[in-house]
Amino acid sequence: MSIVNSIRAQIPPIHREGYPFIGGFALISLLLFWLWTPLGWIGVVLTIWCALFFRDPVRVTPVRDDLVVAPADGRVSMVVSMVPPAELGLGDKPLLRISIFMSVFNCHVNRAPVAGRVERIVYSPGKFINADLDKASEDNERNSMVISTPGGQIGVIQIAGLVARRIVSFVRVGQVLGAGERFGLIRFGSRLDVYLPDGAKALVSPGQTSIAGETVLADFRQGDGGRSYRAA
């Protein structure tokens, strides 16, 4: 393998949603260099940050019907029992909810926590308060999705934050997703909530770091089964 290929292998690919932003930052950097060199270097740093924000590395996902993997890179902020939002249609009984907060330094490509069929997608306009606050799940702009699996229905909510002003979804109702498959992203800091079927057991705790498509969040096992892995 050549040196160029070795370097390329170490650099994660960039998601296509980031191309316009990276190009914009690069153009601004050139203009800043023309005005004053130190400002240009600040622009270069911001361009690199933007590229890192939209990075889309390959992830190796554990594949088993009863495992729930992290839908986002970030920090587990809450593991609680909560009544799911009405738009999910999951009833009024409290369910296990695991929340992941993404800072502006995390990779923001979102991945399916389970394999299954998309049963519902509901967009709800709202505010843009700090996504790390509990009330953000009800007050903020969000995109809610329900995935049907053999073990029950999983609710996944993309929640906009203080800086995040754009939720992007790549999927449609009726689409079948694989565990760890990309389904959307949120631009510039946000949160994801995952609502799990009754009886699910959380395998993470608040403060733990999560890696989208790899970190196992919970188990709703119906029986013993082996674990395999799939790169995505």
From Swiss-Prot:
Active site positions, chain numbering: 190 (schiff-base intermediate with substrate)
Pathway membership: Phospholipid metabolism; phosphatidylethanolamine biosynthesis; phosphatidylethanolamine from CDP-diacylglycerol: step 2/2
Catalytic activity: a 1,2-diacyl-sn-glycero-3-phospho-L-serine + H(+) = a 1,2-diacyl-sn-glycero-3-phosphoethanolamine + CO2
Matches recorded under Pfam families: PS_Dcarbxylase
Keyword Membrane: yes
Cell compartments where the protein resides: Cell membrane
Entry annotated with the keyword Lyase: yes
Uppermost EC category: lyase
Main location: membrane
UniProt family annotation: Belongs to the phosphatidylserine decarboxylase family. PSD-A subfamily.
Protein name as annotated: Phosphatidylserine decarboxylase proenzyme
Origin species: Rhodopseudomonas palustris (strain BisB18)
Gene: psd
